Curated annotation (Swiss-Prot):
It comes from Mycoplasmopsis synoviae (strain 53). GO terms for cellular component: cytosolic large ribosomal subunit. Part of the 50S ribosomal subunit. GO terms for biological process: negative regulation of translation; translation. Keywords: Ribonucleoprotein, Ribosomal protein. This is Large ribosomal subunit protein uL13.
Amino acid sequence: MRQTTIVNKENSNKKWFVVDAENQVLGRLASLVASVLRGKTKPTFTPNADMGDNVIIINAEKVKLTGKKEKNKVYYSHSGYPGGLKARTAEKLREEKPTALLEKAISGMIPHTKLGNQQRKNLYVYAGPEHKHQAQNPERLEVK
């Protein structure tokens, strides 16, 4: 008789992946990375455990937005105080913090729960081509 294997955080085999965001479309890249972070690409996916892998994104400043989104897409944030609403276009947000576009897109695709917060910590985004995770020997993850 076959037994159902219950996989938890301790016996999940976490890998490290590196993704080059240069000339990649923001949403398509974010969707793939969110799936890998959640662990949905693994046959042992368990929705109540952190099964996902670690993902390093390089060249985040060179990610593409299609159409007129660079000027027209607006990101809102609120300080919590009256009159504290800030609105920034994607162009302005990219100037202030080049990694924010990718971080916001991927964060929105992961559940907003305690487990989702753990999974978000496995994402490392760098604006340039260099990263500090060479010791983990990350595999390249290709975006189709």
